Amino acid sequence: MGSLKKRSVNLAGHATSLALEPEFWAALDRIAKQDAVSIAALIQRIDVGRGERPLASACRVYALQRAGG
């Protein structure tokens, strides 16, 4: 996997920066397109359901779960 790429997203009215490998960003972009939502809306959905898990980890797990099923 490549080096981390940072993107800024707005979550619950707060700007936050999220660093993921390009492959995970590509997977999340595909998922957002499939679900007809913006990448910000998808990440907000992941954020709401992540519990205690760090957001970057939750995004990676979500992408892997969606890829597998």
Language-model segments: residues:
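Glycine-rich, flexible loop/turn motifs
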Residues: 5-7, 42, 51
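Aromatic side chains
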Residues: 14, 24-25, 62
